[in-house]
């Protein structure tokens, strides 16, 4: 890894998506359109609700975002699974940022609640991840809680988000 800054802009996130941030074969973010945030505004390994790490990111919402045109015609809403995927993306980024090696895969979560929607008139989505635990053995496993806010109102809450980093010689779970 080149450096451990406390924030990253869009160009940095694209570099991570190209595999240029954490080294070959290690954690990568997806590239657009699946990259679900524009910037990481804060990342550390000693903050958050559990004192084990925090990562916060933002998505600028505009009515021309790709998913609004197809989900649903005449009733545009950001698919909830994309907000959830953003939280998994952030946990994987955190694991790479802390020096974890291997390719990232979402492994599940304990609980997810939606209490609102991201609609085209929303201006900004903020994602927050509070790291609960990082285990390092044959794989690197991160467990975290997260939330998503739309214009300062929390509308998604996820508990026990799980992401693993798998080295090339380790079996990567199917479907991840």
UniProtKB/Swiss-Prot annotation:
Q: Does the keyword Lyase apply?
A: yes
EC numbers, comma separated: 4.2.1.59, 5.3.3.14
Q: Reaction catalysed?
A: a (3R)-hydroxyacyl-[ACP] = a (2E)-enoyl-[ACP] + H2O; (3R)-hydroxydecanoyl-[ACP] = (2E)-decenoyl-[ACP] + H2O; (2E)-decenoyl-[ACP] = (3Z)-decenoyl-[ACP]
Cysteine pairs forming cystine bridges in this chain are none
Where does it sit, as one GO cellular component term? Answer: cytoplasm
Q: Which pathway or pathways does this protein act in?
A: Lipid metabolism; fatty acid biosynthesis
Lipid metabolism is among the record's keywords: yes
**GO terms, molecular function:** (3R)-hydroxyacyl-[acyl-carrier-protein] dehydratase activity; trans-2-decenoyl-acyl-carrier-protein isomerase activity
The similarity annotation says: Belongs to the thioester dehydratase family. FabA subfamily.
Q: How does it assemble?
A: Homodimer.
Q: What is this protein's record name?
A: 3-hydroxydecanoyl-[acyl-carrier-protein] dehydratase
Q: Which organism is it from?
A: Rhodopseudomonas palustris (strain BisA53)
- The gene is fabA
